[in-house]
Amino acid sequence: MVIRSKEQPVVPLGALATTGAIILAARSMKRGEKLRTQVYFRYRVVFQLITLVALVAGGVMMQQESAEQKKTREDKLREKAKQREKLWIEELERRDALIQERKRRLEESRAELKKMAEEGFKQENDNSKGK
């Protein structure tokens, strides 16, 4: 209620003015002052009309603001999605670099083992021939 009152301050003021007009009309009716009673009831109608106009105008303004808020919210969500996508791509690139490094080291290890095996076979062959 307090939040709505801050968003549309004219509506609660109109409601208070309408209530005041009704109270004054009731008091003047109790005293038998017919003319004043009529005047207060006319004030009540005017205050209710002002309150209603303020309520409708506030609703229209809130709709426009909420459309703008929705647009900014969608923009923020798009930006957040772009950031997530960028982070994901960076993570994939990092993982790919690790995989490529592992493959390179594996190939180096294989080449080294193959070289060592060939040297070992050569030594065995040389030792066999030398006997």
Swiss-Prot record:
Transmembrane parts of this sequence: 10-27, 40-62
Domain HIG1: 1-73
Keyword Membrane listed: yes
Record's bilayer topology term: Multi-pass membrane protein
Pfam families assigned: HIG_1_N (PF04588)
Coiled coil ranges: 62-120
GO cellular component: mitochondrial inner membrane; respiratory chain complex
Subcellular location: Mitochondrion membrane
Keywords: Coiled coil, Membrane, Mitochondrion, Transmembrane, Transmembrane helix
Cross-referenced InterPro entries: Hypoxia_induced_domain (IPR007667), RCF1 (IPR050355)
Main location: mitochondrion
UniProt-listed GO biological process terms: mitochondrial cytochrome c oxidase assembly; mitochondrial respirasome assembly; regulation of proton transport
Subunit (UniProt): Associates with the respiratory chain complex III/complex IV supercomplex.
Record's function text: Cytochrome c oxidase subunit which plays a role in assembly of respiratory supercomplexes.
Family the UniProt entry places it in: Belongs to the RCF1 family.
Protein name: Respiratory supercomplex factor 1, mitochondrial
Lineage, uppermost ranks: Eukaryota, Fungi, Dikarya, Ascomycota, Saccharomycotina
